[in-house]
């Protein structure tokens, strides 16, 4: 006997209970309506740091995965899914394996400018035979990567410029984010106005580059000057970056060359000096040429540095005047920083000319008029000395003539006075008791016919005269001799008179027998 089945009247209530039970189970499982929430609209992070992108759900149904994307549309990039795969630098914040976990936030480490963009948290429904279907997406979180700009690099012209030349300098920096940035130029503390400044790209990008150009007018005092490019950005905390260009690497100051003569060390030697002043850089070569032929080659090593950064160099060249019979042209040739040579010439008179003039003279081909001023001054001084010497000699001559006129003893100018002179001499001889008495007489002899000129003879003469005196009371005759010693003849200078008179002095020694 078969068991009896449920009565048909009881089947309806049973099905109703099953449907109610299923409805209650579904309501408890889903809880709330599905909603994907990304609380932050944007976050900023410095390059190299970490950031967290938050995402929460209100329900896990329908069943399906949750994924993170950067960007929207077909070109969006999958960043992370919670399927257990390994993704460098990205991790989930919560443990998604726990029952009823609703937190699907992620952490990005070591952020780079390439990580900038808008990130979306997306809920999918798993399909049985078809691909998963996107159900809902969060509002998106934009990540701003604060990337510091690279240190500015300043570049200048390839070749050195000269004073008063205009040269351009360029400053570049890259890899910064966000796009806003400030760039300024300075020279020796004074701000310069740039010719052009550009930031690329013009639209949105993960990082940006900046380039700026400025024009500088060089001058000879710029050897120690600097051109500075200053970059300010939000990531630098009010400490701008600077790029520096030393103008000493971009300027050339040519030397001023002078050739001068120093005081001679002897009558046959002259020092020539070649000075190269205020030049930069220190690359210098100096060559001495003699009549166009190389005489000496200098490679300076010990240069004198000026306070403005330029250099000086002095080269000495000793000239032996006795070795040159003709005029010689000496050339100082200066080659600086592989530029055309600068030459200065200096002409030196030969030994034949200099011996006639008493000293060696030089004539610089460059403007050396100060040497002539020295010569003129010396000449005037010498002329004054000559005039003074002539005046002194003239006064001395007059005094000598007056002295001769005052010391002259008795002068006899007429021939008939000779007899009286003889009588006076005889009287003097008779009155003399000492045989060695010396008598001085001024004999002005009568003028006779002018003798022919003859060669000068010594002034000291010794003459002997025999003088016979008159009879004396004694029986024997007395013979007296006179020794005329040290006769000095003094002739006067020619005068307007026809013939000048002259006087003779004699020393008479009388010997009595």
UniProtKB/Swiss-Prot annotation:
Subcellular location: Membrane
Residues passing through the membrane, by range: 374-394
Keyword annotations: Disulfide bond, Glycoprotein, Immunoglobulin domain, Membrane, Phosphoprotein, Repeat, SH3-binding, Signal, Transmembrane, Transmembrane helix
Biological process annotations from GO: actin filament organization; cell motility; cell-matrix adhesion; cytoskeleton organization; granulocyte migration; hematopoietic progenitor cell differentiation; negative regulation of canonical NF-kappaB signal transduction; negative regulation of chemokine (C-C motif) ligand 5 production
Record's keyword annotation contains Signal: yes
Bias kind Polar residues: ranges: 504-513
Domain (Ig-like V-type) ranges: 32-137
Motif SH3-binding mapped to chain: 450-455
Pfam families documented for this protein: C1-set, V-set
Ig-like C1-type domain sequence ranges: 149-248, 255-343
GO MF entries: protein phosphatase binding; protein phosphatase inhibitor activity; protein phosphorylated amino acid binding; SH3 domain binding
InterPro entries hit by this protein: Ig-like_CS_Receptor (IPR051755), Ig-like_dom (IPR007110), Ig-like_dom_sf (IPR036179), Ig-like_fold (IPR013783), Ig/MHC_CS (IPR003006), Ig_C1-set (IPR003597), Ig_sub (IPR003599), Ig_V-set (IPR013106)
Cleavable signal peptide: 1-31
Extracellular topological segments: 32-373
Membrane topology term: Single-pass type I membrane protein
Post-translational changes noted in the entry: N-glycosylated.
Any single GO CC term annotated in Swiss-Prot or TrEMBL for this entry: plasma membrane
Glycosylation sites: 54, 92, 168, 180, 205, 209, 246, 271, 293, 302, 312, 320, 345, 367
Modified positions (Phosphotyrosine) in chain numbering: 440, 464, 481, 505
Sequence motif SH2-binding, residues: 440-443, 464-467, 481-484, 505-508
Residue ranges of the region described as Disordered: 444-513
Subunit details: Binds PTPN11 when tyrosine-phosphorylated, except in macrophages, where it primarily binds PTPN6. Binds GRB2 vitro. Binds FGR. Binds JAK2 irrespective of its phosphorylation status and forms a stable complex. Binds SCAP1 and/or SCAP2. The resulting complex recruits FYB1. Binds PTK2B. Interacts with TRIM2.
Record protein name field: Tyrosine-protein phosphatase non-receptor type substrate 1
Biological classification of the source: Eukaryota, Metazoa, Chordata, Craniata, Vertebrata
């Amino acid at each position: 006997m078969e068991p009896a089945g449920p009565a048909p009247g009881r089947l309806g209530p049973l099905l109703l209970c099953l449907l109610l039970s299923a409805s209650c189970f579904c309501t408890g499982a889903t809880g709330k309506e599905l909603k994907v929430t990304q609380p932050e609209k944007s976050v900023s992070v410095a390059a190299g740091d970490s950031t967290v992108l938050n995402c929460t759900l209100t329900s896990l149904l329908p069943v399906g995965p949750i994924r993170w994307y950067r960007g929207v549309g077909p070109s969006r990039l999958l960043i992370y899914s919670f399927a257990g795969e390994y993704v460098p630098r990205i991790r989930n914040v919560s443990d998604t394996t726990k029952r009823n976990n609703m937190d699907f936030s992620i952490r990005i480490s070591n952020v780079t400018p390439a990580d900038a963009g808008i990130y979306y948290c997306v809920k999918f429904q798993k399909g049985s035979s078809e691909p998963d279907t996107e159900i809902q997406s969060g509002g998106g979180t934009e990540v701003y990567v604060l990337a510091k700009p690279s240190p500015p690099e300043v570049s200048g012209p390839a070749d050195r410029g000269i004073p008063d030349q205009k040269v351009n300098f360029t400053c570049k920096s890259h890899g910064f984010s966000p796009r806003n940035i400030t760039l300024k130029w300075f020279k020796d503390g004074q701000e310069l106005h740039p010719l052009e400044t550009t930031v690329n790209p013009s639209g949105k990008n993960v990082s940006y580059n900046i380039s700026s150009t400025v024009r500088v007018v060089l001058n000879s005092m710029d050897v120690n000057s600097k051109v500075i490019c200053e970059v300010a950005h939000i990531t630098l905390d009010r400490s701008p970056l600077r790029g520096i260009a030393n103008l000493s690497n971009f300027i050339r100051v040519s030397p001023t060359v002078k050739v001068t003569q120093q005081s001679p060390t002897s009558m046959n030697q002259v020092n020539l000096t070649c000075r190269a002043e205020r030049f930069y850089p220190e690359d210098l070569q100096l060559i001495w040429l003699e009549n166009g032929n190389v005489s000496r080659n200098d490679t300076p090593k010990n240069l004198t540095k000026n306070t403005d950064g330029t250099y000086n160099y002095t080269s000495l060249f000793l000239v032996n005047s006795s070795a040159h019979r003709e005029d010689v042209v000496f050339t100082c040739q200066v080659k600086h920083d592989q530029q055309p040579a600068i030459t200065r010439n200096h002409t030196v008179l030969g030994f034949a000319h200099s011996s006639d003039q008493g000293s060696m003279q030089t004539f610089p081909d460059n403007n050396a008029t100060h040497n002539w001023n020295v010569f003129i001054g010396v000449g005037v001084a010498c002329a004054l000395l000559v005039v003074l010497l002539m005046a002194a000699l003239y006064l001395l001559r007059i005094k000598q003539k007056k002295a001769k006129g005052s010391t002259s003893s008795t002068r006899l100018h007429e021939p008939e006075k000779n007899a009286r002179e003889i009588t006076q001499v005889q009287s003097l001889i008779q009155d003399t008791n000492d045989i060695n008495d010396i008598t001085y007489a001024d004999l002005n002899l009568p003028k006779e016919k002018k003798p022919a000129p003859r060669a000068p003879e010594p002034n000291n003469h010794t003459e002997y005269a025999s003088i016979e005196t008159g009879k004396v009371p004694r029986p024997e005759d007395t013979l007296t001799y006179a020794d005329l010693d040290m006769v000095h003849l003094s002739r006067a200078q020619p005068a307007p008179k026809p013939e000048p008179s002259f006087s003779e002095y004699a020393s008479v020694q009388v010997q009595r027998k």
